């Protein structure tokens, strides 16, 4: 169980099962859900304290379109007053924006875990580039499964973990307090 933390959920389609699961696991986590495609979000009362933002996080901000988009840096500055935050979990299902947004967001706000649905809207070279980015920035895949909705192989769910975070958890949980340093806390 987590005592507290910061969680980002990008793309909700007005469904909050992910946020419910996080709330059961971490009652004091601050959860921010972003979705500019939902006009009137129906946030369940059990998720009080969840912050819903009616905008999309995009590689470039939008000015005149119907859907408001903000860059990762604008988002972090507006929500937290600073772009210097660390996320416990980043969940992304943004129908193709992951190729541009995920690298920019992780460079500004590293996350201990990343759950992302990767869509086949780009080439395999783009997918390979995104996976290389994740590895070069210290993330390993710990789970992967095909999303069975829609066209075959059109989306794959990936779960990444920060190598540094996994190491800290391993030392703390499996080796005990005797091997835990202040940096592990």
Model-derived features: where do they sit?
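Phosphate/nucleotide-binding beta-alpha loop and adjacent structural elements of enzyme active sites
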Residues: 1-185
